[in-house]
Amino acid sequence: MTITLDELRRDIDRVDEVLVRLLNERARCVCEVGRLKKALGVDIYQPDREKEVLKHVRDVAHEGPLGPEAIGRLFERIIDEARRLERRVVHGEMDGDLKPESLKPEI
């Protein structure tokens, strides 16, 4: 049996849904990190930690068709968004529920 384009697209949609759930789970962790950094008086930007994360994801990238450089670029963007969330937490711009309604776009 040959798989159809529609079937492949449905598979991609399912994977995308999982990715969104995982990214939101990561974002909730990031917000907690932001709260803790605020309480401890620690800077949001932690270049050594970012390098560590990027090295880790590039190292595990060899397990699939996306290579280390592509995965690194994706995670650079994820880290940028994480920093943005942490800034919003530190500056008190987010309410406690961390739902999308509380994540108003920056202007």
Where are these regions (language model features)?
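Domain-level signature for soluble enzymes in the chorismate/prephenate branch of the shikimate pathway
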Residues: 1-107
